[in-house]
Amino acid sequence: MKFAVAIAFTLLVCVFAQEEEEPVTCGGKQCKPNSCCVQNSHGKGKDSPRCHPLGKLNNPCEVEPNENGIYSQHCPCGEGLSCTKVGEPNKLRCQEESGKSDKSKESQGSDESEESEESKESCG
């Protein structure tokens, strides 16, 4: 029975892993996954939208795009991060989501991470 549940779980993980996000169109081009469309209103590249990667830890970020789905200067944060006011003058930066820290990641059992890696490998 446990084996059947493990097989079902692996198949479910594979199905979700293969689902693709709807690509973002930016300046007539499709952005890669984990990116957004930014249209700077200042300096070089003014008014030409371009694809940029989602924010990483401590990168500047934005929360909401305009009505066309375009961000004015920075992408939102990548997975596991949230756009949070940090320091003075309260600039928005990508920070670990509350409740998550390196220690909590380290304290997770190795069985869980091994199972996840096995699932990824079996997806092809």
UniProtKB/Swiss-Prot annotation:
GO terms for molecular function: toxin activity. Keywords: Disulfide bond, Secreted, Signal, Toxin. Residues 93-108 have a biased composition (Basic and acidic residues). Transmembrane segments: none annotated. Its main location: secreted. Residues 109-118 have a biased composition (Acidic residues). Residues 93-124 are annotated as: Disordered. It is found in: Secreted. GO terms for cellular component: extracellular region. Expressed by the venom gland. The keyword Secreted applies. Residues 1-17 form the signal peptide. Disulfide bonds join 26-37, 31-51, 36-75, 61-83, 77-94. The keyword Chaperone does not apply. Belongs to the neurotoxin 32 family. This is U33-theraphotoxin-Cg1a. It comes from Chilobrachys guangxiensis.
